[in-house]
C-alpha cells in the first residue's frame, strides 16, 4: 500500500521566496530543548501532518522525512494533536471511531466510539480535554483524553461545523457553514457571541494563538472563488485576502507568518504568507484531494501563565541525572513522578537511580553493570553477549558467513546467530548492527557517545544543536540558505524552498562558477560569455571586476576565506589560477598534466586544493595551495567528474560524475571511497554539503536535489523555473568554519566585536549598552536601558546575508518581476501531473486539471509541447548597438560584448574617455583628445601617432605633482570599500557617465585598475633612455680625450722649460759634424725617428728672380741637405713676406736630415737641425736664428741674400 502511494500519489511542494519567518529565533518555552554550553535555546523544526486517500502522512516543511504514520485511517478529514503527549487524534467518520497514535506512527489505538455527523474536533491541551461538534444535532461535546466523562458543552446551535479553541484565553470558536456565521463562547459554555455573519459559506476555521486572531476560509455559493479572511477575537479588524488564491479552499492551519491550506480543484496543499497575500508552498498529491491539515510545533500549544506552579507547589527539582523525562510533573497533584529506572527520594523532590544489579532481578546470566537509570549485562573473555542482551555464549564462529551478518556470526544450540561488537546492538532484521562501533554511527548525524556496551547517545559539534529525535544535529544561529548560479542569473533559496528569488540577473550571460566569502559577505562569480570574474555584495550592489584578461571558460571557483585568496579553473585554457581577493598577484597554480578542469574546492585548514579533471584522463586531484605536492585522489571508474566539495566537519570529499550520474564520497586522501547515489541524480554539475545533507544541481531536469550525506537516501528535488543550475554554495556562519567576520570592518560593531561560531557578536564598553540594532552602543547617562538591549547577542538573532537582502527588497518598490514571480517546487518523487509530456530543460510543465502544457522559460518560445531558445541577436531589432558592441546569443538571453574603446555591463556600451582615465599612449608632451571609440594625439597643433614624442617646446600639461594624469572634470571619490582597488599608486574615482569606478593611473601603468604596465610607454621611454645614455657616454669620452690632451700639453710645457738646462752644447757644431758625415746619417735613418728642425722658406716675386738664380748649384745643394723629412718649417712667402713655422714632434736620437729637392726655382728652403737627441718641441725666435747664423759662416753668407725686413715668427 505504501509503495502504491509513493508511486501513484507523489507529494509535490511548491515554494516561492518569503521574508523572515518566526522560525529564525524561538523563545525558550516549555517543550523546547536547550543547547549545550552557551548556545541559545533551540526549538524543534515544525512539520506537517495531513490525511490523504485513507492514510495519514507526515512530512517536514523542506520535503524531507516524508513518512506514512497511519496506513488505514479511514475517512479522516478531522484531526488534531497533543504536542506534549506526542499524540495524534483523528475521527474515522466511516467507522464512527475516535482513534489516536503517537506522532512517530507507533501504538495506534481506538479511544472510543463516537456518534454520527461529527463535523469538527479540537484538543484542549491545558485541561486535557477533547471537544467535538455535531452539525446534525447542533451540539458541542466535551470529554477527557480517554473518551470518558462526556458532557454537552453547548446545545441548540445552528449547524456547528468547524471548532477551534484557545485554552490560554479560554475561548471556543465555531462556524456555521449553512448560516455563514462565526461564533465565540468561553470554555464553560457561557457568554456566547456572534462575531460575523455573511451570505457566503465558511468552510474552515483556525486560530493564530500568538497574534490572537481568528482565520477562516470563505467561499461563494457556487464555489468558484475562495479567499482567506481574519479578524481579532472580538470580531473586529476584519481582513479579506481576496487575491490570495482562486482555487477551492478546503482545510487550513497556521504557524507563524504562514498559512497552510488545502484545495479541492488543484488537489494540493499550499502555504501562503498571511500578511503579504503571496502563495508560498504547494503540496501536490496528484489524484485524491487532501483532507485535514495540521502544522505541529510547541508554539502552537503554549502553556497558560495561570498554569504555572505556585512557589510551594514547584517540588520537582531537576539536578544531577534528573534530565529530560526523568522528572515529570503530575498535572493534578503537582507532585514529581520519576521515569523508569528511578525512584522518588524520601523528601519527594528528587529522583534517585535504582541499582537493578543489587536486586538480582536483572536477568543477566554472568555479569551485571549498573548505570544511571538502567543497567547492562556483561560477559567474560571468550564469551559474547547474545542479541537478547541477557545471555552470554561461548564464542564459536560460524564456518562461513552464510547468515550475511554485518559484523560476525556465532554458533549456538539454536543455530547461527549474528552478534555485534561492543557499543552496538543488532537491528530488528537480525543481521545489521547499529551503534558507535558500526558503520551507521549509531544513527547519529555527528557524534556517537557510548554509554555502555549496548547503549549510546548522540552529540553534536560545537555550534550545532541536537534535535528532538536525539540523533540529528542542526546548525545554531540563522537559517541557512543556498546560493546557486542559474546560467543567466544568480539565485537564493532556503532549504524549505522559501525566500526563493534572483540575486543578480542583469545580463549575466552565462555564469557557472560561484562562491561566497563569509568574512566580507560578498559573492564571487565568473562570466563564461563575457569572460571576466567579478564580485558583488549580497544585495547585488558594488559589483567589481577583478579579472578581465586572459579568461576563457571559467567553470569552477573557490574562496579561501582564511588566507584571503580565490582560485578558479579555466577549462578553455586548461589551467588553474589563483589571486588574492582584490584581483592582485594573479598566478598560475596548475598548468601541467591537466586537460579540462572544472570543479574546485579549497581546504584552508589542510592547505590543500582539490579539483576535478574531465579530460582524456578523468580524475580527482589534489595539491598544495602553491600547486606542488600533487596527489591523485581517484582515477578509476570516472568519466566526467564535475563538481567537488568538502565536508569540513568530517574531512570527507564529495564529488559527482555528470556522465555516469553518480555521487561519490571518500576521505581526503582518497581512501574509503563510497558510491552514495546513482542513476536518479540526472546530469549533476556541482555539489555542496552542510549539516546532514548533500546538495547537487541537475541539468537533465533543471533542479537542485538533496540526499542524506551518509546513506544517499531521503531524496528531495527542488525545482522552479530553473535553466541550468550550476555552482551551489551554502551560506551560514558554520558552513565555512574558522571564518572571523570581526576581521572586516570590526564585524559592523561600534565597540567590541567577538567571533562566535562564525558570527559576529557586538559588545559595548563599560558605561554603554547595545542599541536595538545589536551593532551600535548607547551611553547610559543615568537613563533607563532601552528594551531589547542586552550585553550578548543570541546566535538565533544574528543578521544573515539573506536577512539584509530581504529587508532591502522589502523597502524597494521597483523589484523586478522575476523576483516576485519565482516559484519553487519540491518533489518527493520525479512524477508529476504532466504524464507523458516532457518539456525538456527550457520549459516547465503546468497542469490545469486534466490538461498539461509546457510553459517556456523567459527567453524561450514553444508550441505547448517543446521550447526552443530565442535568438535575440538574429532578430530584426538591434539589441546591441553595432557601432560599439557585438551581440552574443546565450541560452535564454544575450549579452553585448563591447568593442575596443568601449566598456559596458553586458547590455550597454559607453565610450571610454582614454584621455580622462589616463590610459592613452600619447607622448608626454602631446595633447590627448577623446573620440568615439578612440582618441587622437595633438602635437603643437599637428596630429601625431599614439606613442609618438612631441618636441620639448610643448611642455606636458597633463601631469600632476604626484605623477598622475590630470582629469578635466572633478569626480566623486570612491567609498572606503574601494581602498586598494587601484594598484600602483593609482587614484580611484567615480565616473557618473558610465556609472563605474575608474582609476587615474600614474605614468607607465594602464588598465581598469592600473594593473598592467604600459608597454608602449615603456618602449618609448626606454628608447629615450638609450639616447640619453649614448649622449652621456659620448660626453664622457670627449671629456677624457680633452683631459688627456691637456695632460700632454702640460707635459710638453714642462719639458720645454727644462730643455735649456739639459742641452748646453753648441747646436751648430753638432749639426756641422753631422753634415760632414752624410753617409752615416743616411745609415741611421732606419733606426732613429726624424729630429726637430726648422725650415725657412722664401717665395719671391718673379721680379726678384735674378737674385735666386744667382745662387750656385753647390750652395743650393748644401741648402737642400737640410730640407729632407721636415716635420716643421718656417715658410717665408714671397707674396705676403710672412714666415711660417711648422713644428714636428718625433723624438729619439740625432739624425741628420737627408737631401731632398727644393721647391724649384721659385723658392728655397733653409733647414736647422736641433742638436738634442731628446728633442722636445721648442720655439725659435729671431734672436735664436741670428745666433745660429753667426756660428756658421756658410749660413751667414747665404742668409745675407735674404731681405732684412723679414721677421721670423714661430
UniProtKB/Swiss-Prot annotation:
Membrane topology: Single-pass type I membrane protein
Signal peptide as annotated in the record: 1-21
Chain positions covered by the region annotation Disordered: 1065-1084, 1113-1135
Disulfide cross-links: 316-327, 322-336, 338-351, 357-368, 364-377, 379-392, 398-409, 405-418, 420-433, 436-448, 444-458, 460-473, 742-753, 749-762, 764-777, 834-845, 839-854, 856-867, 873-887, 880-896, 898-909, 915-928, 922-937, 939-950, 974-988, 982-999, 1001-1010
Keyword Signal included in the entry's annotation: yes
LDL-receptor class B-type repeats, residues: 86-127, 128-169, 170-211, 212-258, 480-520, 521-563, 564-606, 607-650, 651-693
Keywords: Disulfide bond, EGF-like domain, Glycoprotein, Growth factor, Membrane, Repeat, Signal, Transmembrane, Transmembrane helix
Domain EGF-like positions: 312-352, 353-393, 394-434, 432-474, 738-778, 830-868, 869-910, 911-951, 970-1011
Keyword Disulfide bond appears in the UniProt entry: yes
InterPro entries in the cross-refs: 6-blade_b-propeller_TolB-like, cEGF, Cueball_EGF_LRP_Nidogen, EGF-like_Ca-bd_dom, EGF-like_dom, EGF-type_Asp/Asn_hydroxyl_site, EGF_Ca-bd_CS, Growth_fac_rcpt_cys_sf
Entry GO CC: plasma membrane
Transmembrane segments: 1030-1050
Topological domains, Extracellular: 23-1029
Subcellular compartments: Membrane
A Gene Ontology BP annotation from the UniProt entry: regulation of receptor signaling pathway via JAK-STAT
Carbohydrate-modified residues: 38, 104, 117, 148, 321, 401, 814, 851, 925, 934
One of the Pfam families matching this protein, by short name: cEGF
Molecular function as annotated in GO: calcium ion binding; growth factor activity
Bias (Polar residues): 1120-1134
Biased amino acid composition, Basic and acidic residues: 1067-1080
Gene3D superfamilies from the UniProt entry: Laminin (2.10.25.10), TolB, C-terminal domain (2.120.10.30)
Subunit note: Interacts with EGFR and promotes EGFR dimerization. Interacts with RHBDF1; may retain EGF in the endoplasmic reticulum and regulates its degradation through the endoplasmic reticulum-associated degradation (ERAD). Interacts with RHBDF2.
Role according to the record: EGF stimulates the growth of various epidermal and epithelial tissues in vivo and in vitro and of some fibroblasts in cell culture. Magnesiotropic hormone that stimulates magnesium reabsorption in the renal distal convoluted tubule via engagement of EGFR and activation of the magnesium channel TRPM6.
PANTHER family cross-referenced by the UniProt entry: PRO-EPIDERMAL GROWTH FACTOR, VITELLOGENIN RECEPTOR-LIKE PROTEIN-RELATED-RELATED
Protein name as catalogued: Pro-epidermal growth factor
Organism name: Felis catus (Cat)
